[in-house]
Amino acid sequence: MCGISGIYNLKRNDPISGEILDRMLEAIAHRGPDGKQVMVFDRIGLGFNRLSFLDLKGGMQPLLNEDRDVVMVCNGEIYNYRELREELMAKGHVFTTKTDVEVCLHLYEEVGEEFPKKLNG
């Protein structure tokens, strides 16, 4: 199971500390020995310790969509990701990894908060 950390800042003026996210990930480093990444935006910071099963060289998270306006982290296994990926690619979505969880990002773009209903996993 991967490790996920996050900070959401309610105060627009206060910067989010990447250092704090790094320390959070260090505390759960045993959850993901295959890589670590932190992304900091205006009001949110996300961190991820990766435990790789699919797309061993790619697939680092957090993941961004094509327009870079949706970001996500996910720890899970999506059994029907191949079918969903084909459907989404037919609709014009561009995938940057071969991971199963990237379908969640693009499904969210398609159907919004109802996307989990389409997942088998």
What is the predicted function of each stretch?
Residues M1-G121:
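N-terminus-centric sequence/structural signature that marks the extreme N-terminus
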